[in-house]
A protein has these predicted regions:
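Alpha-helical multipass membrane-protein architecture
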Residues: 2-744
């Protein structure tokens, strides 16, 4: 699959759903069109017919069809809604194997440290690598398999002891062996290990605030500030996640489509045997093929990243003709062109330190240097991003507000429209509400202590406002992402408000954004993991402990690595170029963004050069109001429900290229791949879509990310000096990789 990675950036894992990428929410049928399930009874539909009763397996030996699918007809069902996915795509099988084990905790801790350390290291590398998703699942799989095979197994020793006549409780030494290595590496242990690592990595984005403060501002930075802030942000997001479970986790439409490849990969690795399972064989065939192929576009033959026939046909063009052709059809690197019909077969400086003294605006210096200028395309992208945020808020309330209320009422009555959650209610103790409320209170107090005691230029009242903003936006962002698998970038809203409320304080702006936007981001990620726990039948209280543990562990690990790198390479990181081993480009960009928003009252205020940017919020909301009125009078157009149109996403993508897309060459390939899988396979080959689509996708992701991870150490400069591949026509280092003409 094509990888929309930034230039010289390798993305190993899933994209952050609310960091400038795009996320959304599915249409919800009317209440009488939904199947509502209790945990142990079926109900009669509104038309008087008896709907199918959902049978949850109550023991490992329960061999009902529900352990896998709801009968043979599932193979031909077209997966459209969340109910379709719950009923026909995701099996109900629950082996009731233990989820929390000693080896699982040890491996989860090790994998969490591995992911947190590398994520933090790559933040300061010329080549960025984000380790997550299927890649982590595969590492955990082989690590668990090695543990189970390499150490004495308690189940085997106990079996031998009983064969020799042993009865009752086994001896202490067998119990110890069983505690360390109970038996085969199981699905739930594997999932808990992967989810813990994901929770630990959530802290990496928050730590960017402290790195920027330490590098660019003369403000003290203590371990207390970093660790407590990271824990406060992570836990507050988790507390919000727990409170909005009825709409973001338990709701049948909250599918989290982008996590299904991970779920199907986990289930395939543990539930299917290679010799007897055609889907699992195809998983490894796909993995092997992609592993062998990815070396070409990633290193040897970069032209495969952007195959542009128009560029090939116009290689010798010059002057204005070359410029026009490249601007239209080029797209292999940043700012080259729009990348039309291009196929991807791969997966000036502003004197910031002078203008801001001690993290606060120096108006005398500002008068001397003047205001920074934004490019027209970037200003347009900011406007569209804000319009999408306004549309998101309006769309959620005008189109799905009633659904929110019904979801909480159903949860209070013990009625569930997702059979997976109905099964969880029947067989496992739910995490009490007060646990999550306690997490919210504790994290709030921790953050307040930091704001009051530490010099971070963020007033206590602004801290409270930032959390209230996170509480308001988090449910909207999460419900959108959970239902569509992509969503709306909300990070600009927090930065804009901080800039208007805290003018001239870039450090305070960064902390404000961390306690609002990063809380939102963490809430989305943690809700995604909670839903994955329901799909894999992991007890809710185990999920609670797992995610709390990963969040706290990640705070300490990320701080330790960050402070070591910054103190050891300060001059290189502050320097605009760095070297082949270390680069402060990410921190510099982050700090520049904060600086821009710290001047919001000058740039975006009334009479400012970019005053239309914040007005975009109102325009986006107004468009959704018009859409809602249109739906009222014109509910359908030729059989298509007009309410299906999701304006927030439409608006977001209208400004996508100048704000999000570093390589436009991948867009056309993504459209083709999406049309093939989501339209053709989903509608005309539903069995192939159900059995292979997500599994093969997981294999492609895992293989390509494994190759990129190896290359980052071997040749891309992550583990030493970079070693570029020799120049040839398929690796046009001196020009554009897609061979578009270079205008003079």
């Amino acid at each position: 699959m094509p990888n929309a990675a930034a230039n010289e950036a390798i993305i190993v894992g899933g994209l952050n759903p609310v960091e400038g990428k795009v996320f959304s929410v599915p249409t919800h049928p009317e209440a009488d069109e939904k199947e509502v399930i209790t945990s142990d009874t079926a109900r009669t539909a509104s038309n008087g017919t008896l709907e199918e009763k959902i049978r949850a397996s109550s023991s490992p030996g329960d061999d009902t069809d529900d352990r896998y699918e709801d009968g043979e007809d599932s193979d031909n069902v077209i997966i459209i809604t969340g109910g379709d996915a719950a009923r026909h795509l995701l099996p109900m099988r629950d082996d009731h194997d233990p989820a929390l084990t000693f080896r699982g905790i040890i491996l989860a801790s090790g994998l969490s440290c591995f992911q947190a350390v590398l994520s933090q290291i790559y933040t300061f590398k010329p080549t960025a690598v984000v380790i997550s998703g299927t890649f982590i699942v595969l590492i955990a799989y082989f690590a668990g398999k090695a543990w189970a095979a390499g150490l004495p197994r308690g189940d085997k020793y106990e079996a031998r002891w009983r064969e020799k006549g042993g009865e009752g409780e086994p001896p202490l030494w067998i119990k110890v062996v069983r505690f360390i290595n109970p038996g085969p590496w199981t699905l739930k242990e594997h999932a808990v290990c992967s989810i813990t690592a994901t929770s630990a990595s959530n802290a990496s984005a928050s730590v960017m605030v402290f790195a920027a403060q330490d590098l660019f501002y003369d403000l003290p930075l203590s371990a207390t500030t970093v660790v407590l802030t990271v824990i406060s942000i992570g836990l507050f997001g988790y507390g919000i996640c727990g409170v909005m479970r009825p709409i973001a986790v338990w709701h049948v439409d909250a599918v989290y489509w982008s996590t299904l490849p991970t779920v199907k990969t986990l289930q395939g690795l543990h539930w299917q045997e290679l010799k007897n399972s055609k889907p699992l064989r195809y998983f490894w065939y796909s993995f092997g093929a992609m592993f062998a192929y990815e070396w070409l576009p990633a290193y040897i033959w970069p032209w495969l990243n952007s195959v542009s026939i128009p560029c090939l046909a116009s290689m010798k063009a010059t002057g204005e003709t070359a410029a026009v052709l490249t601007n239209v059809f080029g797209g292999s690197i940043n700012n080259e062109g729009m990348g039309l019909f291009s196929l991807s077969l791969d997966w000036q400086y502003y004197p910031i330190s002078d203008v801001f003294t001690g993290g606060v605006l120096n108006e005398t210096a500002l008068a001397e240097y003047g205001l920074p200028r934004l490019t027209g395309t970037f200003a347009y992208a900011l406007f569209m991003a804000n319009a999408a945020i306004g549309a998101l808020v309006a769309h959620c309330f005008l189109f799905w507000g009633g659904d929110f209320i019904r979801a909480y009422k159903s949860a209070k009555q013990g009625r569930y429209d997702d059979r997976h959650h109905a099964h969880m209610v029947k067989h496992y103790k739910e995490t009490p509400w007060w646990w999550y409320v306690a997490v919210l209170v504790i994290s709030f107090v921790i953050g307040l202590v930091v704001v009051i005691k530490e010099n971070i230029t963020l007033p206590a009242w602004a801290y409270i406002v930032s959390l209230l903003l996170g509480i308001f936006i988090a449910p909207l962002s999460t419900i959108l992402y959970s239902r569509y698998g992509n969503g709306i970038a909300t990070n600009n809203l927090s930065k804009m408000l901080a800039g208007l409320m805290l003018p001239g304080r870039p450090v305070g702006n960064m902390y404000f954004a961390a306690w609002s936007h990063n809380v939102i981001s963490n809430a989305v990620t943690l809700c995604n993991d909670l839903k994955m726990g329901e799909y894999l039948k992991i007890p809710p209280r185990v999920m609670f402990l797992t995610q709390i543990y990963g969040t706290i562990l990640g705070g300490f690990i990320n701080y330790a690595v960050m402070i070591g790198i910054v103190n050891g390479n300060r001059d290189l990181l502050v320097n605009s170029n760095g070297n082949s081993s270390w680069s402060g480009a990410t921190m510099q960009s982050y700090n520049t963004n904060a600086t821009s928003w710290a001047l919001a009252s000058y740039l975006y205020g009334s009479g400012g050069l970019y005053e239309m940017v914040p007005i975009g919020i109102g325009i986006g909301a107004g468009l959704v109001v018009i859409h809602r009125i249109f739906v009222y009078f014109v509910p359908t157009i030729r059989g298509f429900s007009s309410s299906e149109l999701n304006l927030p996403q439409f608006i977001q993508y209208a400004g996508f290229i100048p704000y999000n897309a570093s390589q436009t060459c991948v867009i056309f390939s993504q459209v083709i791949a999406g049309f093939f899988t989501q339209f053709y396979l989903r509608n005309y080959r539903p069995r192939i879509f159900k059995d292979y689509s997500y599994l093969v996708t997981g294999a492609f992701d895992g293989a390509s990310l494994t190759v990129l991870f190896i290359l980052s150490f071997a040749v891309f400069g992550a583990g030493g000096p970079s070693k570029p591949f020799p120049t040839w026509w398929g690796n046009n280092v001196g020009g554009y990789y897609d061979l578009c003409p270079v205008s003079e």
